[in-house]
Amino acid sequence: MGEISITKLLVVAALIVLVFGTKKLRTLGGDLGSAIKGFKKAMNDDDTSVKKSAEEDVPADKISHKE
């Protein structure tokens, strides 16, 4: 009873298409795709900026303790 079968998924998909329509779903899919692209681009930009800042850091002079 709690299992999700392919038949149940198809019925749910058909109901979603009936409620929203194909044009609205296409628009929603395009918006979702562009949002994911933007997120991935931001993540890659963040990684490259971290790498650049790590390369630009100059190591500090070593301090030795004299007794």
From Swiss-Prot:
Keywords per UniProt: Cell inner membrane, Cell membrane, Membrane, Protein transport, Translocation, Transmembrane, Transmembrane helix, Transport
Cellular localisation: Cell inner membrane
Ranges annotated as spanning the membrane: 4-21
A GO MF label: protein transmembrane transporter activity
Biological processes annotated in GO: protein transport by the Tat complex
Main location: membrane
GO cellular component annotations of the record: TAT protein transport complex
Record carries keyword Translocase: no
Membrane topology per record: Single-pass membrane protein
Region (Disordered): 43-67
Function: Part of the twin-arginine translocation (Tat) system that transports large folded proteins containing a characteristic twin-arginine motif in their signal peptide across membranes. TatE shares overlapping functions with TatA.
Family: Belongs to the TatA/E family. TatE subfamily.
HAMAP family listed in its UniProt record: TatA_E, TatE
Descriptive protein name: Probable Sec-independent protein translocase protein TatE
Originating species: Enterobacter lignolyticus (strain SCF1)
